[in-house]
Amino acid sequence: MSELSVATGAVSTASSSIPMPAGVNPADLAAELAAVVTESVDEDYLLYECDGQWVLAAGVQAMVELDSDELRVIRDGVTRRQQWSGRPGAALGEAVDRLLLETDQAFGWVAFEFGVHRYGLQQRLAPHTPLARVFSPRTRIMVSEKEIRLFDAGIRHREAIDRLLATGVREVPQSRSVDVSDDPSGFRRRVAVAVDEIAAGRYHKVILSRCVEVPFAIDFPLTYRLGRRHNTPVRSFLLQLGGIRALGYSPELVTAVRADGVVITEPLAGTRALGRGPAIDRLARDDLESNSKEIVEHAISVRSSLEEITDIAEPGSAAVIDFMTVRERGSVQHLGSTIRARLDPSSDRMAALEALFPAVTASGIPKAAGVEAIFRLDECPRGLYSGAVVMLSADGGLDAALTLRAAYQVGGRTWLRAGAGIIEESEPEREFEETCEKLSTLTPYLVARQ
């Protein structure tokens, strides 16, 4: 098991295996299965890439919906509602643990707003604000370079796989792009306000973001396939769940909790463009590794993450095991670090998630002041953006990927979103340019829905 793996526990459901034919791309096959098996019947699903394996969780057996003012558990068409108070992680964790009494894995997403309760900002949320959606699937299909494994799969799932292996996946048509150069939300102006507030001592860092509207409907599975070929994410995902469609190439882990109690977080902060040719990329990397603004931004993010993980760790177990190395993520390169600890016996995976959520690299420092500034200066609510896509296992494991470099669709609206970390040395024009670089993870690879 790799350092960042989350064990899935022993399989207790009916399973079968199909050898993976040579030359078949597992990401392509998994995304096409999502299109054929789930989207064709308008069924909720989540596809999650983790450590060389794509897990397609198809169909909802039971769903946990956590809102700011209510918890709902939906099973067999029956919805049970209850009010909750205190920590959202405790409320969500208890409900998810019940799901995991009957299955090995659960999947879902956690909104940015899930993290505001820890900082006393829950009164800033509108009624019925979605905080999390987690479900146990009817069927799981795990795709890797070696094999395809099916759990509780029906005839139509097996037939879909046989058909795709026999005929091949669809060709990806020509992509379309969108213009990211406009600034209708006044991002540069908002950055300037944040710089003034930082200079006045209100906080040290804040991540501000901007949305880019996509003026056409996109084919999410095809876009995922095309974009995945050009990205090197730590995790990736494709989903239709809880009223939202999304796909993304996550650059970092918010939290990974292993069954043996090891906790990992991987803050990335500090950015330069990538993919402009070897010589230009080398110059950008050298600048990234020597630029005082980027180094300061990264160092204070690592310090904050280390303090947060210490809150839920066994005393003396928290350590930075990899500091400020360059991580390549598609169209950009980042300074990244890895922090590891051992979960204290008095804590659990939800306590670990809450301690590190929202990610310091998507909120601010100090985090309470940064989140408060986001409520005032950013386009809110953020929802899934800068939240997490999660996979949980019955053995206590958790894998939570930061939701960035993603496309979203709710109703008839499709959009992208990207942000930048603002510190006192920030320049509005450079921060705007950084959002353009991050948006380039997706903008060349948008496939219109036919």
Curated annotation (Swiss-Prot):
Binding site for Mg(2+): 297, 431, 434
Site entry: Could activate a water molecule for attack at the C2 of chorismate and involved in recognition/elimination of the C4 hydroxyl: 268
GO cellular component, as recorded: plasma membrane
Positions of the catalytic residues: 252
Keyword vocabulary terms for this entry: Isomerase, Lyase, Magnesium, Metal-binding
Activity at various pH: At pH below 7.5, MtbI produces isochorismate and at pH 8 it produces salicylate.
Annotated phenotype, changing residue 405 to A: Only the chorismate mutase activity is observed
Effect of residue 252 to Q: No activity is observed
Organism: Mycobacterium tuberculosis (strain ATCC 25618 / H37Rv)
Organism domain of life: Bacteria
GO biological process terms, semicolon-separated: catechol-containing siderophore biosynthetic process; cellular response to iron ion starvation; iron acquisition from host; L-tryptophan biosynthetic process; salicylic acid biosynthetic process
One GO MF term attached to the UniProt entry: oxo-acid-lyase activity
Requisite cofactors: Mg(2+)
Reactions mediated catalytically: chorismate = isochorismate; isochorismate = salicylate + pyruvate; chorismate = prephenate
Induction: Induced by iron starvation conditions and during infection of human THP-1 macrophages. Transcriptionally repressed by IdeR and iron.
Gene name in the database record: mbtI
Protein name in the entry: Salicylate synthase
EC number: 5.4.99.5, 4.2.99.21, 5.4.4.2
Annotated control of activity: Inhibited by (E)-3-(1-carboxyprop-1-enyloxy)-2-hydroxybenzoic acid (AMT), 3-(1-carboxy-2-phenylvinyloxy)-2-hydroxybenzoic acid (phenyl-AMT), 3-(1-carboxy-3-methylbut-1-enyloxy)-2-hydroxybenzoic acid, 3-(1-carboxybut-1-enyloxy)-2-hydroxybenzoic acid (ethyl-AMT), 3-(1-carboxyprop-1-enyloxy)-2-hydroxybenzoic acid (methyl-AMT), 3-(1-carboxy-2-cyclopropylethenyloxy)-2-hydroxybenzoic acid (cyclopropyl-AMT) and 3-(1-carboxy-3-methylbut-1-enyloxy)-2-hydroxybenzoic acid (isopropyl-AMT).
Binding site for substrate: 270-271, 385, 405, 419-421, 438
